Amino acid sequence: ADRRHSRVAERIGGNFPPVVISDRSNGDFEFDHASQPDYIYIGKEDPENLPDNFRLLVDAHFWKERPNAYPFFIASEIDELKDYSVPLKFIRLTYRDLTDRVIEVLKQDKSVIVILSTHHRNGIAAERAAMHHLLAAGCDVPVILHRDYRETDIEALQLKAAVDFGTLLLDGFGDGIMLHNEGCETMVTDSCMFGILQATR
């Protein structure tokens, strides 16, 4: 399927290849240089503790202005987006958060990227519904597909993630992916994401 048209913010969206965002909020900063993620989510960690060349997502209230560090918001913080003038802002939303008012903010603020999350039993359907909702509203915000797992078995994680992400990517949805898993090393999760993107190119 053709990829959904999204605007470009920095190098996310448009015709840029989908990005990988690695969730390192657990404080694990070991990387496999063969599969270096495009962005790293560090949660409440102090961005000063990491090298400048890492592009970091930092929880908005812990964010500090420095090269390559971007604030990460949750749905309840939508009204705070306007207080930050940075080239990129990330906000984690679910399908249910996409009210008319929220969509209006996403349309107006061209620096925003949505991290689309789901707690729904049928996550694929929920994320697909969210993408169709954005399309119907004429909202071209770039969207990163996000999933949470609790898998200790690497193969089970790979299979589950390949279906959950791959189905939507092959439908033309998603300007990147972000996978959080309790149970495996973070480098395993990263290589799983790179594998999914290679398989869906």
Could you tell me what each predicted segment is?
Residues 1-78, 82, 88-95:
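Active-site loops and adjacent core secondary-structure elements that bind or stabilize anionic groups
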Residues 7-13, 67-70, 76-79, 85-201:
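Catalytic alpha/beta core domains of metabolic enzymes, predominantly
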